[in-house]
Every structure is written in structure tokens, then in C-alpha cells.
Design a protein with these regions (language model features):
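Non-heme Fe(II) oxygenase metal-center motifs and adjacent flexible, charged/small-residue loops
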Residues: 1-216
Length: 216
């Protein structure tokens, strides 16, 4: 499918209580980002993690950076070691780091120092249930989330799971940044609809940057 808006300029969409959508912010960097995703996955392959309750997640995941988000029978945690390879997670590519810092600065977080990037791969039908990002030691640091490939519906709620949800269309190259009052808001991705994108074929990638260790 051709992108009819390939020449459109990036633009910001501030939302209530802190989140900002940076539309098309990652568009020009997308090809390099996807090459680097493939390089990371060649070292730490995508896998469908199993939650502590025994549920196999529909989204395939891997990590890069000093710390990687993973699961075990005790819960969710960050670890410097990939439990599948028993090696350190791949280093965060420079393209990832540069984009993340530019996006964080554009959204008002110039001091953000990401040390973890969770890479999610969505096939048609894959989803991410409502959840809070609360496994990080310093919740003052924001979340930076990059969308690549097929479009998806991003659900963004409040501090309670049953708070009303905003449903926002995220397209190729969009970046969402949230922190402050909204840092612990529930969020998720609705089941991905089938489609085709010239850079990612039948899937969507998401890069989620966090500060998972203590800031030096």
C-alpha cells in the first residue's frame, strides 16, 4: 500500500494530562530503524513471553540496551542478560538512541536517558492488554513509544483500569511520549488488523524506550 502522505510534515498532537503524539516524527528514520531491529533480532531473537500466570503473550518481543524487560514465574523484571541466549542484550543502536532523545526533547523531557528498549512485533490479531508501566525505579522518567509499519489503535486511559479510554490511531512513524501525571496511566493496543506495509510487510513494530536503571 502506498503512503499517500509521504510528503506530509511531522506535527504534534498534545493530549490531556501530559501525553504528546509526535505524528510522523520517525518517518524519515524508519528504514534505518528497521534494519537495526533486524540486527538486534539476529542476536536476541523475537519470542512470545509467558506471563507469571501462564499466559503466552500474542506479541513477539526482544530487547536492546543495558537492560531488557522480561518475565519469569515470580513476575516482571529488567535484566542485563537475555534468558534465552544467556548473553547480554544487544547494545542499543545509535539510530534508536538518537531518535528517542530527539523525541523526548520535543515533548519536553530533554534530560531523558533511555537504557532499555523493548521491541514488540505485532502480527495480525496480536494485541497488548491494558497495563501500567511500573517496573522502573524512577517513575519521573517518561516513556517514548515509536510505531513502525501497519497502523494500530492505541488505547490510553487513566490511573484505574476501568477509567474511560481514548482510542488513538497510530501510523507509521508516529511517536508517543508520556510522563508526569500520565506516567502510570493504563494503556494498550487493540488487535492488529491485517494489512501490508512496504517496509514491514504484514506486521507492526513498536519500540518502547524506558529508563529502567537508576539515573547516574
Amino acid at each position: 500500500m502506498l503512503d499517500l502522505f509521504a510528503d506530509a510534515e511531522p506535527w504534534q498532537e498534545p493530549l490531556a494530562a501530559g501525553p504528546v503524539i509526535l505524528h510522523r516524527f520517525a518517518f524519515n528514520a524508519a528504514e534505518q530503524l528497521i534494519r537495526d531491529i533486524n540486527d538486534v533480532a539476529s542476536q536476541s531473537p523475537f519470542r512470545q513471553m509467558v506471563t507469571p500466570g501462564g499466559y503466552t503473550m500474542s506479541v513477539a518481543m526482544t530487547n536492546c540496551g543495558h537492560l531488557g524487560w522480561t518475565t519469569n514465574r515470580q513476575g516482571y523484571l529488567y535484566s542485563p542478560i537475555d534468558p534465552q541466549t544467556n548473553k547480554p542484550w544487544p547494545a542499543m543502536p545509535q539510530s534508536f538512541h538518537n531518535l528517542c532523545q530527539r523525541a523526548a526533547t520535543a515533548a519536553g523531557y530533554p534530560d531523558f536517558q533511555p537504557d532499555a528498549c523493548l521491541i514488540n512485533r505485532y502480527a495480525p490479531g496480536a494485541k497488548l492488554s491494558l497495563h501500567q508501566d511500573k517496573d522502573e525505579p524512577d517513575l519521573r522518567a517518561p516513556i517514548v513509544s515509536v510505531s513502525l509499519g501497519l497502523p494500530a489503535i492505541f488505547q490510553f486511559g487513566g490511573l484505574k483500569r476501568n477509567d474511560p479510554l481514548k482510542r488513538l490511531l497510530l501510523e507509521h512513524g508516529d511517536v508517543v511520549v508520556w510522563g508526569g501525571e500520565s506516567r502510570l496511566f493504563y494503556h494498550g493496543i487493540q488487535p492488529l488488523k491485517a494489512g501490508f506495509h512496504p517496509l514491514t510487510a504484514d506486521c507492526r513494530y513498536n519500540l518502547t524506550f524506558r529508563q529502567a536503571g537508576k539515573k547516574e
